[in-house]
From Swiss-Prot:
Its main location: membrane. Keywords: Cell membrane, Chaperone, Lipoprotein, Membrane, Palmitate, Protein transport, Signal, Transmembrane, Transmembrane helix, Transport. It is a multi-pass membrane protein. This is Membrane protein insertase YidC 1. GO terms for biological process: protein insertion into membrane; protein transport. It comes from Streptococcus mutans serotype c (strain ATCC 700610 / UA159). GO terms for cellular component: plasma membrane. Disruption phenotype: No visible phenotype. The gene is yidC1. A lipid is attached at C21 (N-palmitoyl cysteine). Pfam families: 60KD_IMP.
Length: 271
């Protein structure tokens, strides 16, 4: 788990570093491969813009990206659900190998891998959508700050290439990020401290970063996380999962009670 969050942290740090690189204007004549990619993003957004409304183009572009990545996000949700179900067994392994010596750690890692293999779980599946989205976010940021026809666009109360003057988008991005994390972990049988902490820290991080990002990037974040909230409710609804789990537990208890009653009845007949 710690390694996973370390990878997330490194990916975010890389995005921030790379976002600071490259300030020159990107045009259709740019020869650099990355700048061509950035310009392709810009042209795609312009194509999707209705009546020249760049904000609409960014919203439709976000829907397009999220729809393309839908299978990966679905894999992420299913893998996360299986990981949550595995937590009791993983905790049992931690109890079995409490030592910090190299041999204990190796044995615990080996048995953990066997568990993942047994249940068909990839512990890093949840990182795939994030790692794919990082270059998308970077390219979008570069397009909004280095391509003239996007940089000068406007939508509602904001200039697409500048930060939101009223900070509405960063706040919405943080809210939808929190809802997405909360819904993802809602059905977990057990919640560890790291999970709870990340549910709080990640939205705050998004909020603080969003204050200084171009409004277009913040808009992408809002739409992307709102899309994910509805996706979770549609494909992996935690309330339905909890209700189904409760139903199965009630059925198991009822079955156990019937067995006990049958044993008592049989015992009385023998008497």
């Amino acid at each position: 788990m710690k390694k996973k969050y370390r990878i997330i942290g490194l990916a975010v740090a890389a995005l921030l570093f790379l976002s600071a690189c490259g300030r020159s204007q990107v045009t259709s004549h740019s020869s650099d491969a990355w700048e061509k990619f950035v310009y392709f993003f810009a042209e795609t957004i312009r194509f999707l813009s209705i009546n020249g409304r760049i904000g609409i183009g960014i919203i439709l572009f976000t829907f397009l990206i999220r729809t393309i990545l839908l299978p990966l996000f679905n894999l992420q949700l299913k893998s996360g659900q299986k990981m949550q179900e595995l937590q009791p067994e993983l905790k049992a392994l931690q109890t079995k190998y409490p030592g910090k010596d190299r041999e204990s750690r190796m044995r615990m890692a080996e048995e953990s891998q066997e568990l993942y293999k047994k249940y068909g779980v990839n512990p890093y599946a949840s990182l795939f959508p994030l790692l794919i989205q990082m270059p998308v976010l970077w390219a979008l940021y570069q397009a909004l700050t280095r391509v003239e026809f996007l940089k000068t666009g406007s939508f509602l109360w904001m200039d697409i290439g500048n930060k939101d003057p009223y900070f509405i988008l960063p706040v919405l991005a943080a809210i939808f990020t929190f809802l997405s994390s909360w819904l993802t972990n809602k059905a977990a049988k057990e919640r560890n401290g790291m999970m709870i902490t990340m549910n709080i820290i990640l939205p705050i991080f998004i909020l603080l970063i969003g204050f200084n990002l171009a409004s277009g990037v913040a808009l992408y974040w809002v739409v992307s996380n709102a899309y994910q909230v509805f996706q979770i409710l549609l494909l992996n609804n935690p309330f339905k999962i909890i209700a189904e789990r409760q139903r199965l537990e009630d059925e198991a208890r009822e079955l156990e009670a019937k067995k006990r009653r049958a044993k008592k009845k049989a015992h009385k007949k023998r008497k």
